[in-house]
């Protein structure tokens, strides 16, 4: 018996509001992250990821307040990312109730930051978020590059080598998003997910491209992911977390069924 695989709904939050709309039935306010997080908690999600995409620094206090509110309502692990640039940011988020903190651009600018964070707070709460885009031609060996700034800025870093380096530096988990697949509903980039999962000794969360429940199964069975992250298929009520878990279980994936 391996470890049960995890389903992780993701909330993108801007200035304290969930964006990429949420259309739950009978949610009074589709933009309130606390209400939405609580809904996912009650629906049997294994974890929740909260990505703060707020550009401005002034809003950080809003974020901490929101994290505190979510943590008081939610009894599953909560990962928070976005704008994490200093050890102080991590401390503040953990104190507010986050269980794990995701580091993205700051890791690229200063890889030592990940090492310092893991030494200070423990690898178990440091997630490195990787946004990767395929840069190889179809005929060549697959190669993916790390992009920052929401996928706009190429770094020249090879995604597989970078994932290895980050786990060497102490990352306890990799949150892997395919920029090519994000928002397409065509499924995860399975080759990318598999390449990273095979390269690192820590759990990999697959993200980007989920359009149906079979995609979740493929991420685990073909991609080797330990967890699957999705936003729109859950937000828009196309599928419930419970339906997703039952579908994955029936496909032979070990799940925690509540």
Curated annotation (Swiss-Prot):
**Record SUPFAM superfamilies:** Ribulose-phoshate binding barrel (SSF51366)
A single GO cellular-component term from the record reads: cytoplasm
**Which catalytic residues are annotated?**
12, 131
Transmembrane segment boundaries: none
Q: Which Pfam families match?
A: His_biosynth (PF00977)
Question: Which GO terms label this protein's molecular function in UniProt?
Answer: imidazoleglycerol-phosphate synthase activity; lyase activity
Pathway annotation: Amino-acid biosynthesis; L-histidine biosynthesis; L-histidine from 5-phospho-alpha-D-ribose 1-diphosphate: step 5/9
* Catalytic activity field: 5-[(5-phospho-1-deoxy-D-ribulos-1-ylimino)methylamino]-1-(5-phospho-beta-D-ribosyl)imidazole-4-carboxamide + L-glutamine = D-erythro-1-(imidazol-4-yl)glycerol 3-phosphate + 5-amino-1-(5-phospho-beta-D-ribosyl)imidazole-4-carboxamide + L-glutamate + H(+)
Keywords for this protein: Amino-acid biosynthesis, Cytoplasm, Histidine biosynthesis, Lyase
Leader peptide range in chain numbering: none
Describe the subunit structure: Heterodimer of HisH and HisF.
HAMAP family with a match to the protein in the record: HisF (MF_01013)
Give the family this protein belongs to, as stated in its UniProt record: Belongs to the HisA/HisF family.
Q: What does this protein do?
A: IGPS catalyzes the conversion of PRFAR and glutamine to IGP, AICAR and glutamate. The HisF subunit catalyzes the cyclization activity that produces IGP and AICAR from PRFAR using the ammonia provided by the HisH subunit.
Q: Could you identify this protein by its name?
A: Imidazole glycerol phosphate synthase subunit HisF
The uppermost taxa in this organism's lineage are: Bacteria, Pseudomonadati, Pseudomonadota, Gammaproteobacteria, Oceanospirillales
